[in-house]
Amino acid sequence: MSFTPGKQSSSRASSGNRSGNGILKWADQSDQSRNVQTRGRRVQSKQTATSQQPSGGTVVPYYSWFSGITQFQKGKEFEFAEGQGVPIAPGVPATEAKGYWYRHNRRSFKTADGNQRQLLPRWYFYYLGTGPHAKHQYGTDIDGVFWVASNQADINTPADIVDRDPSSDEAIPTRFPPGTVLPQGYYIEGSGRSAPNSRSTSRAPNRAPSAGSRSRANSGNRTSTPGVTPDMADQIASLVLAKLGKDATKPQQVTKQTAKEVRQKILNKPRQKRSPNKQCTVQQCFGKRGPNQNFGGGEMLKLGTSDPQFPILAELAPTAGAFFFGSRLELAKVQNLSGNPDEPQKDVYELRYNGAIRFDSTLSGFETIMKVLNQNLNAYQHQEDGMMNISPKPQRQRGQKNGQVENDNISVAAPKSRVQQNKSRELTAEDISLLKKMDEPYTEDTSEI
């Protein structure tokens, strides 16, 4: 006996018209229901999966009994756990709950900017022995097919399920037993992701102006129930900041006090948990650069992990598993250098490690990594070799005028002239004669030439 999803099996016969798939239909009911559904429009059945005939002619449609599952996030795998993934269908026992999900690659469309955009695929369920892969055994490795079955089903025999006739049977909304985990990045068609008012608003102009139709047509224009608004998060944040006495419109500035707090918070952490940044530099976290700490130079010492070049170096850092299982470890007890005799003495240990990070030229960003490594490895040596010992500028003592120098060892340049030397000399007879003429009264010369 074949089973029909959505129909309870019954052994009772009837004198009505029985279709080929075993579903009882009365002729007047069938015609009436078709007229009600179409309302004068041509019936266009939805094709869920297609395959080409050997002759290469027409397209043979396969109709799933259930609504599809659509992907909405790229890169997500379609999969169910073992024993899960078969939709619930009244009238189908658990022994027949076996089949496969078929990936239907949808068409692409042209966007406003002229580019082609491919729609993400949609998956449909077919019982074992039906659909586009009816001839394949359960578990056959086929691209775009994911096999599922309940724990009570016999996967060695096809499911005794009739094919769906779209003219008489509508697709059943996909539902799963409790505990089923839906694949991440997928949603069930008709589960509420589409706009709920689109159907009522699109059908409203074609309905007769009855009371019921008016209420349905206006349902799309109703104001939504007060709920979450787009700016509700901003309002809540503003209320919280106002409660704390802060202004949300003013940008938060990093003051010396906040920088000191951040630095102290970092330094309170164990040495191996510190992350240097602008507020707490590399030397403040780990000390000066030297033979045992030979990485870092220039801006990277000031910025630490905030340096724009640091993230690409972080790709080389080992994981916790690689650190413990891929290194040579040695536990050593060291001297406690706390220096406070009042505090109880603690046993201090060091977990010393020795390992290597191996990479080659095929690594993404290899050239940049090599450049950054060459700039920062043993950079402290280049800084000491190229550093110039410039004496500090002498500071002027309070009350001392500019130009006064108290150091007698500083030599002063020789004056360039006698006037600059400011030395006294004896007057000659010619000088005395000139001085007398300057003292005589001035008389105007009236002689004619």
Curated annotation (Swiss-Prot):
Location comes to: Virion; Host endoplasmic reticulum-Golgi intermediate compartment; Host Golgi apparatus
Q: How is it modified after translation?
A: ADP-ribosylated. The ADP-ribosylation is retained in the virion during infection. Phosphorylated on serine and threonine residues.
Q: Where is the CoV N NTD domain?
A: 61-190
Tell me the leader sequence span. none
Which GO terms of the molecular function aspect are on file?
RNA binding
Instruction: Give residue spans, biased composition: Low complexity.
Output: 9-22
Q: Provide GO CC annotations from the record.
A: host cell endoplasmic reticulum-Golgi intermediate compartment; host cell Golgi apparatus; ribonucleoprotein complex; viral nucleocapsid
User: Which spans does this entry mark as compositional bias, Polar residues?
Assistant: 29-38, 45-55, 194-204, 212-227, 400-410
Q: Where is this region: Dimerization?
A: 266-385
Record's family? Answer: Belongs to the betacoronavirus nucleocapsid protein family.
> Which residue positions does Phosphoserine occur at?
S167, S191, S391, S424
Q: How is this protein named in the record?
A: Nucleoprotein
